[in-house]
Amino acid sequence: TYAVASLDLMSYDIDQGTFENLTLLILFATMVVIALLFVAFRNVKGVLFPVISLNVALIFTYGFLNILGIKFTALEVAVAPLVLGLGIDYAIHLQRSFACHRNNTDDVAEAWMRACGKLSVPLSLAVVTTVAAFLANLVSPLPPLSTFGIALAFGVICAFLTSTLLIGALHVTFNAGAISTERK
């Protein structure tokens, strides 16, 4: 018997096994995110808006990789749970701050803007440092690691933007007529 082994064959097997688990991995990460959001907010909007936002961030991230013509490998599969895990943090902080400001005003848009204003510096610094850390992979001699760094950096930026813009827009759109329950 003869055995053939090469890096290309091993990479192919690893990629195939990983792709088969992609759906399960994303579903598990999403379920963990939903559980954390439910514990944090205990209402449908508090859970649904960040989930929508993070899924849009993932669509943008993987779409960006596709537009660049980047070959989808096992490392890119790991982008989804990492972006979900990092992005949920932005959503939780913003929604907590929004809830505090919502108790002081009937204007939903004003409450969201105050929340964003209060957290703009700390969240921006968190995003910048995280993106810089992921972009450090660009100096790697291994092309898949460079691609992984680009994907994660772009994913974090997308998660931040969708958390600040999309979640805010959803709150303004679907809470416009509501008055804060604690102010009634």
Model regions: which residues?
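Membrane-embedded transmembrane helical bundles of large multi-pass transporters/channels
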Residues: 2-184
